[in-house]
Curated annotation (Swiss-Prot):
Annotated S-adenosyl-L-methionine binding sites: A36, G37, H38, D55, F81, D102, Q109
GO BP of this protein: rRNA base methylation
Purpose: Specifically methylates the N4 position of cytidine in position 1402 (C1402) of 16S rRNA.
EC number of this enzyme: 2.1.1.199
Name of the protein described by the UniProt record: Ribosomal RNA small subunit methyltransferase H
Cellular component annotations (GO), alphabetically ordered: cytoplasm
Family statement drawn from the similarity comment of this UniProt entry: Belongs to the methyltransferase superfamily. RsmH family.
Entry-linked InterPro entries: RsmH, SAM-dep_MeTrfase_MraW_recog, SAM-dependent_MTases_sf
Top-level class of the enzyme under EC nomenclature: transferase
Pfam families named in the record: Methyltransf_5
GO MF annotations in UniProt: rRNA (cytosine-N4-)-methyltransferase activity
Family matches, as Gene3D superfamilies: Putative methyltransferase TM0872, insert domain, Vaccinia Virus protein VP39
Catalyzed reactions per annotation: cytidine(1402) in 16S rRNA + S-adenosyl-L-methionine = N(4)-methylcytidine(1402) in 16S rRNA + S-adenosyl-L-homocysteine + H(+)
Length: 309
């Protein structure tokens, strides 16, 4: 069995462990376990504490089950993190000392041609986070979308400045080519690119693939849903850590933090009140130069740390 470092390099591991402020007897929740990079490090810090790990990807879950099959301190759940509250009944835990969300796509997912997440490998246009339960692939969705709707998706989730030519080209390609692949899709996008975007092909392609993936997996809705219940899962003096990778996620998380930490100190009181929630660091934590050199894919990662007092 390959170890998790051979499959995927989790970002900001040292920073995550430091900021979780782990209690060896505490209960922790990793809502996006992936290939257990963060989870394994959390578990190393626990004695009688527990770790609940969740992931939507069955391949990740299978890996974690093999990795932790002898560990009674670990509970593994296969589901989208937006559905996590329905699983609380099977747990003896209702609140946690720390919760982690890493919103990035794993290196393993990107590197596997059959997953269809990357334009660098030729494979089916799949892009499903949950291949075991999701029926529609990205190719199916592209076939069913109108040019207008696809254009809106590219602009909203990929920040594509001139999405219409791309949408027209993609619709024509999926209708005329029976078994269109990821590299063929990338070729269509390159041919349809206009203006300045034509000269930023790699970044541009990544944004197009990102937009399709986000829409297919309903990532934004799922993130917003999770953020509504996470505060209720936190104990007092616990922390919530979230790692974002693109501006859409970051905006949602920043708005969430702003509302959660909004607090006005009453002037009339003789003592200062402690806000219910606070940011541990005013600015998001970024990867070190050493990590950037070892793992260039970490360059977009930003870690936010919120404490419930």
């Amino acid at each position: 069995m390959l170890n998790n470092q051979q499959i995927h390099q989790s970002v900001l591991i040292n920073e995550v462990i430091h900021n979780l402020n782990i209690n060896p007897c505490g209960n922790y929740l990793d809502l996006t376990a992936g290939f257990a990079g963060h989870s394994q490090k959390i578990l190393e810090k626990l004695t009688t504490g527990t770790l609940t790990i969740n992931d939507v990807d069955k391949e990740s879950i299978n890996f974690c089950q093999k990795l932790f099959f002898k560990n009674n301190n670990v509970v593994i759940i296969h589901d989208n993190f937006a559905n996590f509250p329905v699983h609380l009944k099977q747990l003896s835990i209702t609140k946690f000392d720390g919760i982690l969300m890493d919103l990035g796509v794993s290196s393993h997912q990107l590197n596997q041609p059959n997953r269809g997440f990357s334009f660098k490998n030729d494979g089916p246009i799949d892009m499903r986070m949950d291949q075991s339960n999701q029926k529609n692939t990205a190719l199916t969705v592209l076939k069913n979308l109108t040019e207008q709707k696809l254009s809106l998706i590219l602009k909203k989730y990929g920040d594509i400045k001139h999405p219409k030519p791309i949408a027209i080209g993609l619709k024509k390609a999926v209708q005329t080519e029976k078994n269109l692949t990821t590299t063929q899709l990338a070729k269509v996008v390159k041919e349809c690119a206009t203006g300045f975007e034509k000269y930023q092909s790699r970044n541009y392609l990544a944004k197009v693939f990102q937009a399709i993936r986000i829409y297919l997996n309903d990532e934004i809705t799922n993130l917003k849903t999770a953020l509504t219940f996470i505060p209720n899962l936190l104990k007092n003096n616990s922390r919530f850590l979230v790692i974002v990778f693109h501006s859409i996620e970051e905006k949602i998380v920043r708005n969430f933090i702003a509302k959660l930490t909004s607090f006005i100190q009453p002037e009339a009181l003789p003592i200062k009140l402690t806000p219910a929630y606070q940011l541990i660091t005013k600015k998001p934590i970024l990867p070190s130069q050493k990590e950037l050199e070892l793992n260039p894919r970490s360059r977009s990662a930003k870690l936010f740390v919120i404490q419930k007092n």
